[in-house]
Amino acid sequence: MLMRLLSLLTLSLVVSGCNQAAPVAQTSENSDIYVVNCVTFEEKPVELVLYCADAGQILNEITWSSWTPTEATGVGTSTANDCEPSCAEGKDVISAVEIKLTKPVTSESGKRVFSNIEIQYDKVQPSGVMDEVLDLPTDVFN
């Protein structure tokens, strides 16, 4: 009796599997383009250090809405030192940001990297700006 039940169960599983479509491969937005984050090449980083020497400004909590071979866009938070009265004693200024990476180039390491970042802040920054365009490093520091 048990053998007959197991046989029927196995048969029903085989037959039910025949009516299902083959799984479709998931497509990825992996575009083999990176941004240099001080000492690493990264795709879609959640955190991006803009000034590697002192980490005076960091973009964090980044959510990327688009990441293509020519451009990447996202939103996040900027944490920047106001350097008042000095950078050692400064306080962090936190702002919501919109980020756009552009101008892909080939690094000396042979990787495609974004070489430009556009940042729009939700409030005036310690530097006095609300919009900023910066050149990014195109190779990692060793």
Report the location of each language-model feature.
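Mature extracytoplasmic domains of secretory-pathway proteins
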Residues: V49-E108
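Sec-dependent bacterial lipoprotein signal peptides
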Residues: M1-S16
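Intrinsically disordered, low-complexity regions enriched in small/polar residues
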Residues: V36, S66-P69, N116, K123
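N-terminal export/targeting and maturation segments
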Residues: P23-C52
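Helix-rich interaction surfaces within compact, conserved domain-sized segments
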Residues: E89-N142
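Bacterial signal peptide processing site
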Residues: C18-A21
